[in-house]
Amino acid sequence: VDVSGDAAAGEKAFRQCITCHVVVDDSGETLAGRNAKVGPNLYKVPGRHAGQIEGFRYSDSMSQAGQNGLVWVEEEFVKYVQDPTGYLREYLGDSKARGAMTHKVRKEDEAVDIYAYLASLGVHEE
């Protein structure tokens, strides 16, 4: 997985994500966040197909994007977190598509750094 951001800066920027997200490794250790369960566990998101965490109820649009082949590489992650619903509408070519994530990461460099931080915690290997 290619990463261009600053993981240390991403750790700080990730604070805006912990209201809804947690990063818990395969052994059950919490690497980031507290106990939020609103959004999916972000462990090993970099390199993973979208909408693939078992037991998490994704929006229909996110599930469809994953089935269509969306993989969380840096470029796609950065575009998504800046405008989740807009991204899914464009990706799926469906003006009615909706993302469940309401928060938008306002700054592109923060989104890049958050991706680097998540990659530092674990990368999905096929």
Curated annotation (Swiss-Prot):
Keyword annotations from UniProtKB, A to Z: Electron transport, Heme, Iron, Metal-binding, Periplasm, Photosynthesis, Transport
InterPro entries hit by this protein: Cyt_c-like_dom, Cyt_c-like_dom_sf, Cyt_c_1A/1B
Post-translational modification: Binds 1 heme c group covalently per subunit.
Residue spans crossing the bilayer: none
Pfam families assigned: Cytochrom_C (PF00034)
Disulfide topology: none
GO CC terms, sorted: periplasmic space
Keyword Ligase: no
Binding-site list for heme c: C17, C20, H21, M101
GO molecular function (one): metal ion binding
Location within or outside the cell: Periplasm
Entry-linked PANTHER family: CYTOCHROME C
Main function: Cytochrome c2 is found mainly in purple, non-sulfur, photosynthetic bacteria where it functions as the electron donor to the oxidized bacteriochlorophyll in the photophosphorylation pathway. However, it may also have a role in the respiratory chain and is found in some non-photosynthetic bacteria.
Identification of the protein by name: Cytochrome c2
UniProt organism field: Rhodovulum adriaticum (Rhodopseudomonas adriatica)
Lineage, uppermost ranks: Bacteria, Pseudomonadati, Pseudomonadota, Alphaproteobacteria, Rhodobacterales
